[in-house]
A protein has these predicted regions:
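Positively charged n-region of N-terminal signal peptides that target proteins for export
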Residues: 1-5
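Bacterial N-terminal signal peptides
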Residues: 7-17
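Cleaved targeting-peptide boundary
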Residues: 20-30
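Metalloprotease/metallohydrolase-associated module, dominated by Zn2+-dependent proteases
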Residues: 32, 38-44, 104-163
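Hydrophobic beta-strand residues in large extracellular and virion-surface proteins
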Residues: 42, 67-69, 86
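Active-site scaffold of zinc-dependent metalloenzymes
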Residues: 47-80, 96-97
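Short alpha-helix carrying the canonical HExxH Zn2+-binding catalytic motif
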Residues: 78-94
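Catalytic Zn2+-binding segment of zinc metalloproteases
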Residues: 90-107
């Protein structure tokens, strides 16, 4: 009986997102340092594509990956706006380090429900992605909702710690 109760409590703890607030620019600086330290260029620049806040790309010819935060769409004075974009794009860097998805398949339905319930606008955006990109974007949107320590620890796990 106790195991069943603990199992339910653990499931609920996963389902309820932590506030997606960076404690300030310290968390942003820490994650940016980690991303840069992993070999990814982190840039702040104007983006010409409408409606995007940032992007992550890998250039095969130069073997360099780049994380861009769009200075013309992200309010750099708002740590939450910067954090959400950085956490999202850093998730794509984590996926590159891992060579694929970073969250166990069994958790995907919970992640989808969480987005649908707590951030329906993210869920609607996610549904517009192609099936080949949906899983990667799901993880990135979901990671925006996590506590900064979780994001930082997860980045360290995938991009600095090798078993």
């Amino acid at each position: 009986m106790i195991k069943q109760v603990l199992s339910v409590i653990a499931g609920l703890a996963f389902a309820i997102p932590a506030p997606a607030f960076a404690t300030g620019f310290e968390d942003i600086s820490r994650l940016k340092e980690l991303v840069s330290g992993s070999g990814t260029k982190v840039l702040l620049q104007n983006c010409t594509e409408s409606g995007i806040y940032g992007y992550y790309e890998y250039n095969q010819s130069t073997n360099v990956d780049t994380l861009v935060i769009c200075s013309n769409t992200v309010d750099r004075k708002d740590p939450d706006a910067v954090w959400e974009t950085l956490a999202h794009e850093a998730t794509h860097a984590m996926q590159a380090c891992a060579g694929g998805p970073i969250v166990d398949d069994v958790l995907v339905p919970r992640m989808l429900r969480e987005l649908q319930e707590f951030t329906p606008h993210y869920y609607r955006i996610l549904m517009k992605y192609s099936s080949s990109q949906k899983r990667f974007e799901l993880e990135a949107f979901w990671m925006e909702l996590r506590h900064p320590k979780f994001v930082i620890d997860t980045f360290t796990k995938f991009c600095y710690t090798r078993d």
